[in-house]
Curated annotation (Swiss-Prot):
The gene is rnpA. This is Ribonuclease P protein component. GO terms for molecular function: 3'-tRNA processing endoribonuclease activity; ribonuclease P activity; tRNA binding. Belongs to the RnpA family. Keywords: Endonuclease, Hydrolase, Nuclease, RNA-binding, tRNA processing. It catalyses: Endonucleolytic cleavage of RNA, removing 5'-extranucleotides from tRNA precursor. Its EC number is 3.1.26.5.
Length: 118
């Protein structure tokens, strides 16, 4: 059985980690969010989140968005390639229901998985 935790090793923690992803990344986007991906040297994917106040105004809104993205990543982590992912929220992301956001994330995870596998 696969372990479905979201431990510290599955997160991008330092500004250098984020900088690497922003420099050369595959991009999958929608009007609501963008996911950047770049291969890493580890044997597992890692997740970073960028949710600007300018895009989602309230702290509960930003926290809700991050919680949903982390949960989607946690459930999909074993299907994802060994990439560093950064999810960037756009203004309209706060208007999506949980179900719509999960479906959108699934679609984008799948698209990035195909891109990185060739």
């Amino acid at each position: 059985m696969n372990k479905l935790a979201f431990s510290r090793e599955l997160r991008l923690l330092t500004p250098e980690h984020y900088k690497k992803v922003f420099q050369q990344a595959h991009r999958a986007g929608s009007p609501h969010l963008t996911i950047l991906a770049r291969p890493n040297d580890l044997n597992h994917p890692r997740l970073g989140l960028a949710v600007p106040k300018k895009q989602i105004k309230t702290a509960p809104g930003r926290n809700h968005f991050k919680r949903i993205v982390r949960e989607s990543f946690r459930l999909k982590q074993h299907d994802l390639p060994a990439n560093d992912f950064v999810v960037i929220a756009k203004k309209s992301a706060s208007e999506l229901s949980n179900e719509e956001l999960f479906k959108l994330l699934d679609k984008l995870w799948h698209r990035l998985s195909r891109l990185s596998r060739g």
